[in-house]
């Protein structure tokens, strides 16, 4: 009898836990994805803060020349970063127990792996949690689909690119200047500015910003006034009301006269789908571009493609970019190798023709 009661009590505790996790009445929805998201993001955040403040220098290139990234070792907020795991580790899974000591683990950049892997798992669970909450509330799943764009971008930069290049040391450092360094080196090695998928991503981000600003300004400029001139227009509305708060016909008419008739939307659902899809698709393409360049399928190369009737090279903007890329590549990992890979080839490419 006692055993039966204990089993029932145990089952009820588990049942209460399940109900609490999946309840949409909580101030913050937990969800089953949240059960995994919370510890992974807390781990990533905690290790990041501690390492950013106090981590010792890391031998990023695997040549016994450690690079300092933390505040206590001479950096500031701008120059500080979590230095990627050493090239000596490569793509090996490198938890603390794989190192001979904590000092060795820190020297080889172990914190970078633990942060990145927990972070990627955490943001993927956050995306799943968005879908889960939408499902519980009877909503459509497009919020999670939109969030998949930054998740794909982060996965491309922190996981796919290191896999393609053969080492976590090629991942993006976790800091402000480290991010810019990653961008410069990426341009030098992969000519990303000449990759069409990156161009689509730029159009998506800047276009999305423009369209959001246009939409917000049009809506706030065409509110339906429910109050007198002596009261704020905001006082005429309440959260969740069924009536329209702005006049889309007026906004459509204004914008149609400002540009031309078919440049504006007269359907609210089409408009908001466009506002969501434009930047999301652009960032998807950028993530796909990073993932292809990870395996050295690089941007277009038009170097020395224009010649005169006598075969002499007429320099174009592509040749200027090529020269800049070589300069950036020479500066990168200057002690790890004497020449960038394309200069160290059997036949170096001519720059001046």
Swiss-Prot record:
Q: How is it modified after translation?
A: Tyr-161 forms a radical intermediate that is referred to as redox-active TyrZ, YZ or Y-Z. C-terminally processed by CTPA; processing is essential to allow assembly of the oxygen-evolving complex and thus photosynthetic growth.
* Residues flagged as site, Cleavage: 344-345
One GO CC annotation: photosystem II
Primary location? plastid
Enzyme Commission code: 1.10.3.9
Membrane-topology annotation of the record: Multi-pass membrane protein
UniProt-listed GO biological process terms: photosynthetic electron transport in photosystem II; response to herbicide
- One short Pfam name that applies is Photo_RC
- What does the cofactor section's free text say about binding? The D1/D2 heterodimer binds P680, chlorophylls that are the primary electron donor of PSII, and subsequent electron acceptors. It shares a non-heme iron and each subunit binds pheophytin, quinone, additional chlorophylls, carotenoids and lipids. D1 provides most of the ligands for the Mn4-Ca-O5 cluster of the oxygen-evolving complex (OEC). There is also a Cl(-1) ion associated with D1 and D2, which is required for oxygen evolution. The PSII complex binds additional chlorophylls, carotenoids and specific lipids.
In the record, which positions carry Phosphothreonine?
2
What result follows from mutating residue 291 to N? In strain: KYT
Q: Which family does it belong to?
A: Belongs to the reaction center PufL/M/PsbA/D family.
Q: How does it assemble?
A: PSII is composed of 1 copy each of membrane proteins PsbA, PsbB, PsbC, PsbD, PsbE, PsbF, PsbH, PsbI, PsbJ, PsbK, PsbL, PsbM, PsbT, PsbX, PsbY, PsbZ, Psb30/Ycf12, at least 3 peripheral proteins of the oxygen-evolving complex and a large number of cofactors. It forms dimeric complexes.
Looking up NCBIfam families in the UniProt record yields: psbA (TIGR01151)
Q: Further notes on this entry? A: 2 of the reaction center chlorophylls (ChlD1 and ChlD2) are entirely coordinated by water.
- Return the protein name: Photosystem II protein D1
Record organism:
Conocephalum conicum
């Amino acid at each position: 009898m006692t055993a039966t009661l204990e089993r029932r009590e145990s089952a009820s505790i588990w049942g209460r836990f399940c109900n609490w996790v999946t309840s949409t009445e909580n101030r913050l929805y937990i969800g089953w994805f949240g059960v995994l998201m919370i510890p992974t993001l807390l781990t990533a955040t905690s290790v990041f803060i501690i390492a950013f403040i106090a981590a010792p220098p890391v031998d990023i290139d695997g040549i016994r020349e450690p690079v300092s990234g933390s505040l206590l070792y001479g950096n500031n907020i701008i120059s500080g970063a979590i230095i990627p795991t050493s090239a000596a580790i490569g793509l090996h899974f490198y938890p603390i127990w794989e190192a001979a000591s904590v000092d060795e683990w820190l020297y080889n950049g172990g914190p970078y792996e633990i942060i990145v892997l927990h972070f990627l798992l955490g943001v993927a669970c956050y995306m799943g949690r968005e879908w889960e909450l939408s499902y519980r509330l009877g909503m459509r799943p497009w919020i999670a689909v939109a969030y998949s764009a930054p998740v794909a971008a982060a996965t491309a930069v922190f996981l796919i690119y290191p896999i393609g290049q053969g080492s976590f040391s090629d991942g993006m450092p976790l800091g402000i200047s480290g991010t810019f360094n990653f961008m410069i080196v990426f341009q030098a090695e992969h000519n990303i500015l000449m990759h069409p998928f990156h161009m689509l991503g730029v159009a998506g981000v800047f276009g999305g910003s423009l369209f959001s600003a246009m939409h917000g300004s049009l809506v706030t400029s065409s509110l339906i006034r429910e109050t007198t001139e002596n009261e704020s227009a905001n006082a005429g509305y309440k959260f969740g009301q069924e009536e329209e708060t702005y006049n889309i016909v007026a906004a459509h008419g204004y914008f149609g006269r400002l540009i031309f008739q078919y440049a504006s939307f007269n359907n609210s659902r089409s408009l908001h789908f466009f506002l969501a899809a434009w930047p999301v698709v652009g960032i998807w393409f950028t993530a796909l571009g990073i993932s292809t360049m990870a395996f050295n399928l690089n941007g277009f190369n038009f170097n020395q493609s224009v010649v005169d009737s006598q075969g002499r090279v007429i320099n174009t903007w592509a040749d200027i970019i090529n020269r800049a890329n070589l300069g950036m590549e020479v500066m990168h990992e200057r002690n790890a190798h004497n020449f960038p890979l394309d200069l160290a080839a059997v036949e170096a490419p001519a720059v001046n023709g």
